[in-house]
Amino acid sequence: MSQMGLHPRRGLTGHWLQRFQPCLPLHTVQWRRLLLLAFLLSLAWPASPLPREEEIVFPEKLNGSSILPGSGVPARLLYRLPAFGEMLLLELEQDPGVQVEGLTVQYLGQAPEMLGGAEPGTYLTGTINGDPESVASLHWDGGALLGVLQYRGAELHLQPLEGGALNSAGGPGAHILRRKSPASSQGPMCTVKAPSGSPSPISRRTKRFASLSRFVETLVVADDKMAAFHGTGLKRYLLTVMAAAAKAFKHPSIRNPVNLVVTRLVILGSGQEGPQVGPSAAQTLRSFCTWQRGLNTPNDSDPDHFDTAILFTRQDLCGVSTCDTLGMADVGTVCDPARSCAIVEDDGLQSAFTAAHELGHVFNMLHDNSKPCTNLNGQGGSSRHVMAPVMAHVDPEEPWSPCSARFITDFLDNGYGHCLLDKPEAPLHLPATFPGKDYDADRQCQLTFGPDSSHCPQLPPPCAALWCSGHLNGHAMCQTKHSPWADGTPCGSSQACMGGRCLHVDQLKDFNVPQAGGWGPWGPWGDCSRTCGGGVQFSSRDCTRPVPRNGGKYCEGRRTRFRSCNTENCPHGSALTFREEQCAAYNHRTDLFKSFPGPMDWVPRYTGVAPRDQCKLTCQARALGYYYVLEPRVADGTPCSPDTSSVCVQGRCIHAGCDRIIGSKKKFDKCMVCGGDGSRCSKQSGSFKKFRYGYSDVVTIPAGATHILVRQQGGSGLKSIYLALKLSDGSYALNGEYTLMPSPTDVVLPGAVSLRYSGATAASETLSGHGPLAQPLTLQVLVAGNPQNARLRYSFFVPRPVPSTPRPPPQDWLQRRAEILKILRKRPWAGRK
């Protein structure tokens, strides 16, 4: 049984986000709900389109003014547009907040014809007929216009007409203009009355302890199915989705300054030797992870380098038992070039949350319903956050759960995000406009449910959940995946959605202004981790004065401080070290080791443990020799190893002095006296070469001995002699009864002392430890062959005898002496000369 039997290694387990089937507002069985609502809709709305007005228009481009330097885009664009009997004059200018400078699309393979090469467009904003209350938000590719117009309470949607002819003036050609009916207008209603008393429908679904800016340089890949579905709008769509994902990572609930940066965009065409994208999510992920590594450059400073890669596909992904899978990623792999990758099934604009979810796994986050998260989130805290196991409406006020924030913080604090500290030389700006301005409710439905879907406007309340048209068994129906309308989607006259609520457009301005955060005061010191022997206590502060808003910068700097506490020695009755106590707590955990013959005696394992793993609880079964990581961290204040006074703090080895104070420079001398000068002990050394078959005594090392070192030297017969240790009671601590310990091990001695043994199979055996020994120890040698010219050398330090000082006479003796002298002075001879 390997270590993985207890603690699966990060990255070996894939996680996927599930989606709900179309769900309707009734509390009975879902399939019956679908049939019932489809039937009601077939009566109230017999296959007729949703109420809206449409007409074909030909926008006329008027003369633009000067060209913006280096961009080829006019500084001001004028368009004249006939609209439902009225002529509209659009005064447009480039929106500086939505440029994506420097980003070029890389096409691999044969690009679909509808792509037509890279999308050269830009984002425009402006007014209509000079009305300051009007809003024009359009995407312009040099000809065609796509976007939303809001004018005098009307909401107009403009998009190119596929196959439309150019107008007579050589303008951008035929467009379709739709005027949507106000949400309050009367018309065919889709209402279902729930039984009396039923609940309302609801949605389901690298400095230590320092906050440092992280920059996640991301490769975004879209497969040929994405290209075929989105056509020329693919680049804009991908950037819009990634902008929403980046916005989620900027929310203060993640408690870290994480910047998601798109550095490369690759679109795959047919015939490309790319990743194998198929129904199996696991196989697709493995194929993509292998393929993306070939695109990366190992040099982190190279502009083409990326820290993680994400694949978007329209392929229906399947897990082990169902095809309700929206994405998959390895866990805790962000700086592993081979496994820092994720796949996302495109499901409309809400795919931004799928992307954020999968990248959360890459940052070592678990699902919010996992056992560790249940303890951190509390009851009912697992359904409205990004890392919920099933896609649902994400709480805009707290998109990341306390568990997600804790796991990414610990992950970064432990040094696993080292590759994210370099800031891109030329950061690329993702679209800053709200996605709902570019993608109206109808388009959002098409992205989610297909090109024939449109918005069902009669299902209140607006913004909370996007309801879209569809068909079931020939009957019209409305369906939802419980995702809210995209932020910025018009929801009424001078109103737009934000966080699932319909707000006045003036209120949206509050969401556009970033506010940087500031540190609050330090909190009180917490409890000490130990009652004696040197513990640790913490104090922390939060980024709350003020809390960052609207993508504002999260606080940087030290967020947690710690100090030593209860540094006095533990009582002499403590037979075990602090680490030994933690291992011994597993002595009766037979439920974790069912393959073992019975309860095991667990002791610390130091030999063979890498320095980076010193603060994991690695314990060894004394009888079997197997060792396992029983806990990912030892308790705070546990010494990192027997050879150092440094202690573990939150899973990391922190320097401490021999006085058990963190940051202290005090050291043990050879006598193991803290801060001593080495004068209290003397070195004893010698050699041994009188070998005979069997066991022979070499030297008895006295109690109190320190810095013990035993080493074999020279000769061709070293393999025939072995070290052994015998305790004062006659029992063996090492290699007794002709039974050898072949591999490196820690020899645990009475008094919580251990010696490090190289193992009997080592080319040259060694035995070492700091001590001091609690009782005498006899060093022996076991001879099993013909040792020629072999020699054994040993050394250790023993306390010097304390020089005796004359004891002062007792007080009563001094008093009696004074009385005797007084009597003698009174004798007759006392005054004679």
From Swiss-Prot:
GO terms for molecular function: metalloendopeptidase activity; metallopeptidase activity; protease binding; zinc ion binding. Glycans are attached at N63, N299. Its main location: secreted. It is found in: Secreted, Extracellular space, Extracellular matrix. InterPro entries: ADAM_Cys-rich, ADAMTS/ADAMTS-like, ADAMTS_ADAMTS-like, ADAMTS_CR_2, ADAMTS_CR_3, ADAMTS_spacer1, MetalloPept_cat_dom_sf, Peptidase_M12B. Interacts with SRPX2. This is A disintegrin and metalloproteinase with thrombospondin motifs 4.
